[in-house]
Amino acid sequence: MKFALATLACATSAAAFQPTTFLRAPVANVAADSSSALSMRYKVAVVGGGPSGACAAEIFAQEKNIDTVMFERKMDNAKPCGGAIPLCMVGEFDIPESTVDRKVRQMNLISPTGVEVSIGSTLKPDEYIGMCRREILDKYLRDRAIEYGAEAVNGLVTSIDIPQNHKTSDARYTLNYLEYSEGSNAGKPSTMEVDLVVGADGANSRVAKCMDAGQYNFAIAFQERIKISEEKMAFYEEMAEMYVGDDVSPDFYGWVFPKYDHVGVGTGTVVNRPAIKQYQKAIRERAGDKIAGGKIIKVEAHPIPEHYRPRRVQGRIALVGDAAGYVTKCSGEGIYFAAKSGRMAAEAIVKLMKNGTHLPTQAEIESTYIKDYDGLYGPTYLVLDVLQKVFYSNNGAREAFVELCNSKYVQQVTFDSYLYKKVQGNNPLDDLKLLGETIGCLVKGYAVAKPDQEFSNPVESQKRI
């Protein structure tokens, strides 16, 4: 569910896509003998094997002075996710086309009153939005990290013993985890000492809790994978759909995204999480005959962070991906930012380690990884936050949003912003014209829209994770 309302952010977004260095030299597996600077050998634990963890582990594994251990409880896990990835990720992270189920070149936006706008006419023939199944993409990234030398542990990290003086170079972290053998549901309690930890274990991050990273507000994303007939699947060959309206979500959107041989149908909300199944029923009804008669083959639900964690580095523990809160508002995009943050964190830490002669401090990690990431993408998160508040707040604004997407200028900068994580060719005159169109569309939208249904859940809305 990753690219929906990047639309108007394009005119003001300041984030630019700047590929980071990606080491490719193969490394030999050398047994760890000490974590001292004299032996130039350290152990890094990457907790989580999704895109953020796998991309971090891949960088660490290519360093001869680092032993890399990657923990993942469910190696075949299919995380609830729309599965959209931008074109720049395919190239930057060397994603093979075999992991891309569908190449979406057209997006239908459907307003609360049923007005449809198709976007995608500005795309070049070789441009597309990739649709992936997370179980396929994640496995590919994990396997690549393992090929470079990362040790994969099928285990669940339950807690971390953090020494009182953990900001000093001679202190080590003890990971307590359950290790699972193949075919067993019972985990064997185990421990491991490491010099540095990267928390890539998702929105419900145990690493974040152990390091007292603070809480954040969250959305619930709910998705059903529905197998439909080949005839109906043909409609979604290169097509995705986005539905807006308070019937499908009071603050987000509903989607129908094509997968390999089925569609993902889902929605999400922050402000009314208890009603998520009601909203899911509504998105199925609005999709109507296009998915009628389909068989639900999988039901998925998962929390999605709404903003950064208050603390993302503590001592030599750093958070990346969903654990850090790197999911954009409006679009709910997280895969690219997970992979990017994992890589950026690992590259910064590797550089700070100076060929195994130095363990980085909290201040050093914050002044490199955190500063660089926020400098690149902070403006994008801010703008999309504002846009979500403006265009997802009520049905009148949602009607205006869909109508605005008729603009070829909006479509052009939308796809430039999403596909390449940069804005190309913004024209001040066109931006000024867009402002006028926005005001006009809002006036018209409020005139035709039906009132939003009222709801109240003051206790649930205060919950944080």
What residues fall within each predicted segment?
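N-terminal chloroplast transit peptides
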Residues: K2-V27
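FAD/FMN-dependent oxidoreductases across multiple families
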Residues: S159, V271-I349, M353-K354
